[in-house]
C-alpha cells in the first residue's frame, strides 16, 4: 500500500485524535473513518498519520498566522524555512514537498488546498463541491468545503481521485486522452498581479501551451459586483456556526465543547489557544442567526450568482472557452507571529471557483528566488476529470517544473553551497 498523510481536520478510525489544531478537540477520537479515508484504505492506502494545519482551517482570527496551531506549533515551508507554507492545509503541502509522502489529503473552503500546494511547489486539486463526502470532517462551510488531493505529480492527484470517487481508473485513464487541438483557454489577465517572477513564468507557460496547439483568449477584467466580498465573508460566518455546532454534536462525550459558544469560552481559559492571535471570527460568527435568516439566503444567492451564472459559466460561454487559467498565487511571504499573514493580494483567482464550488488545479510553474510559483486551471461544475487532464497536459508540456526543496534558512542567505537563482 502507498503511505499517505491526512489533514488533522479529517477523521480516521485509528487512535489519532482529529483536533483541527485545537486542544479543545484533543479527545476527539470517534472510532470512525470519514468516507474518503475509508475509500482510500479500501484502495490500499496506508494512513501514515495526520498533518498540522492552520488552526480551525484558518477560520478563527482575522490576524492569524498560516500553518500555526496550538496543538502542533508552526509548519515551515521546506523551500525557505522562514517563509509561510500558506494554509490551511499547511502540513499536507509541506510534507508532500519534503518527500515524506507522495500524496496527502487537504481540505479547502477558499484557497486552503490551492495556496499551500502552490507555495510549497506541488500539485493541488480542489474538486467540485459535493463530489467527495464531507462527512466526519471538521467543517467551515456547507456550500464551499471539500477535501482534495495534494501530490507530487498530476497523475498522483488522478490516482487519489479515482480512489476517493471509486471511479475505477477513469481519472488516470483520462490523462492519456489527447486534449483536442481546438481547446481554448481563457487567460484571466486581471489575476496576473504585479510579481515579476510570476509573470515571467506565466508568460513562459502560455508559450509552452501555444507550442502544443492550445488557443488563448485574454480576459482583461471581470467584476463580481457590489457588496460581493462582504456577502461572501458573511456567508462563511453563518455557515461556520451552524455546521460546527452540528459536527460537535456528533463527537464522543469526552469532547467537552459542544458548540461554538463553548469553544469561545474554552479559548478564553486556555492560554495556549490565544497566545499568537485572537478569536475575532469566532466571536462575530457566534452573534449571527441560523441558516433560515433572510440575510444569509440573500448573501448566498448574491455570491453564487456572481461566481457561477455571471462568473465562470458566463465567461466560458461568452468566449467559447474550455478552461480558465491564471497564476495560482504570488510567491510566499514571511512567517510573522506578531502581525499575522501579509498575503500579497492581486495574483490568482482561486476565490472564484472556491465560492462557485467549481474544480481548480494548481501545477508547479517554476520558481522565483527559490520560491515556487504555480499555474491554475479552472473549469465548470463537474468538469473535474477534464481540469486534471489539462493540468497534466501542462505538466508534460513544461517538462514538470517541480523543484526539490532547498531548506534555505532565508532568501537572504548567501553561503557557499547555496545558489540563489533569479
Task: List each model region and its residues.
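Short helix-loop capping/hinge segments that flank enzyme active sites or metal/cofactor-binding pockets
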Residues: 1-20, 182-188, 238-307, 362-372, ...
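Gly/Ser-rich catalytic/binding loops embedded in alpha/beta enzyme cores
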Residues: 1-110, 128, 316
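Structural recognition of the beta-strand scaffold that forms the well-ordered cores
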Residues: 3-6, 39, 46-50, 102-106, ...
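Short, well-ordered beta-strand elements within core beta-sheets of diverse protein domains
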Residues: 5, 24-28, 145-152, 378
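Glycine-rich, small-residue loops and helix-cap segments
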Residues: 7, 42, 164, 283-422
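Glycine/threonine-rich flexible loop motifs
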Residues: 18-26, 195-196, 333-342
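Acyltransferase
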Residues: 34, 197-222, 243-253, 260-267, ...
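A short helix-breaking turn/cap at a secondary-structure junction
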Residues: 123-205, 223-226, 269, 398-422
Amino acid at each position: 500500500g502507498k503511505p499517505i498523510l491526512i489533514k488533522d481536520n479529517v477523521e480516521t478510525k485509528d487512535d489519532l485524535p482529529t483536533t483541527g489544531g485545537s486542544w479543545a478537540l484533543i479527545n476527539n477520537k470517534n472510532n470512525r473513518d470519514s468516507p474518503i479515508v475509508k475509500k482510500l484504505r479500501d484502495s490500499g492506502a496506508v494512513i501514515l498519520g495526520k498533518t498540522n494545519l492552520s488552526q480551525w482551517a484558518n477560520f478563527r482570527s482575522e490576524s492569524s498566522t498560516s500553518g500555526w496551531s496550538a496543538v502542533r506549533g508552526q509548519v515551515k515551508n521546506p523551500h525557505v524555512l522562514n517563509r509561510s507554507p500558506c494554509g490551511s492545509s499547511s502540513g499536507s503541502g509541506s510534507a508532500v514537498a519534503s518527500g515524506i509522502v507522495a500524496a496527502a489529503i487537504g481540505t479547502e473552503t477558499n484557497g486552503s488546498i490551492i495556496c499551500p500546494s502552490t507555495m510549497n511547489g506541488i500539485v493541488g486539486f480542489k474538486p467540485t463541491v459535493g463530489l467527495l463526502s464531507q462527512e466526519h470532517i471538521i467543517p467551515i462551510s456547507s456550500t464551499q468545503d471539500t477535501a482534495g488531493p495534494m501530490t507530487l505529480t498530476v497523475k498522483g492527484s488522478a490516482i487519489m481521485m479515482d480512489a476517493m470517487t471509486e471511479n475505477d481508473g477513469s481519472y488516470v485513464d483520462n490523462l492519456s486522452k489527447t486534449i483536442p487541438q481546438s481547446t481554448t483557454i481563457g487567460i484571466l489577465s486581471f489575476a496576473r498581479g504585479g510579481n515579476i517572477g510570476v509573470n515571467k513564468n506565466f508568460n513562459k507557460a502560455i508559450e509552452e501551451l501555444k507550442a502544443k496547439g492550445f488557443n488563448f483568449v485574454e480576459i482583461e477584467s471581470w467584476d463580481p459586483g457590489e457588496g460581493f466580498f462582504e456577502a461572501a465573508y458573511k456567508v462563511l460566518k453563518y455557515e461556520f456556526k451552524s455546521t460546527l455546532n452540528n459536527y460537535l454534536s456528533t463527537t464522543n462525550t469526552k469532547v467537552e465543547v459542544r458548540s461554538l459558544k463553548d469553544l469561545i469560552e474554552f479559548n478564553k481559559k486556555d492560554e495556549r489557544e490565544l497566545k499568537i492571535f485572537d478569536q475575532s471570527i469566532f466571536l462575530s460568527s457566534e452573534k449571527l442567526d441560523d441558516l433560515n435568516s433572510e440575510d444569509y439566503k440573500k448573501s448566498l444567492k448574491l455570491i453564487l450568482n456572481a461566481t457561477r451564472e455571471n462568473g465562470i459559466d458566463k465567461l466560458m460561454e461568452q468566449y467559447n472557452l474550455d478552461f480558465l487559467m491564471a497564476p495560482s498565487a504570488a510567491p510566499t511571504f514571511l512567517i510573522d507571529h506578531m502581525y499575522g499573514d501579509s498575503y500579497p493580494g492581486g495574483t490568482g483567482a482561486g476565490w472564484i471557483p472556491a465560492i462557485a464550488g467549481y474544480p481548480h488545479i494548481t501545477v508547479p510553474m517554476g520558481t522565483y528566488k527559490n520560491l515556487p510559483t504555480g499555474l491554475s486551471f479552472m473549469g465548470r461544475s463537474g468538469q473535474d476529470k477534464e481540469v486534471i487532464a489539462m493540468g497534466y497536459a501542462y505538466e508534460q508540456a513544461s517538462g514538470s517544473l517541480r523543484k526539490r526543496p532547498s531548506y534555505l534558512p532565508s532568501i537572504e542567505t548567501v553561503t557557499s553551497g547555496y545558489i540563489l537563482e533569479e
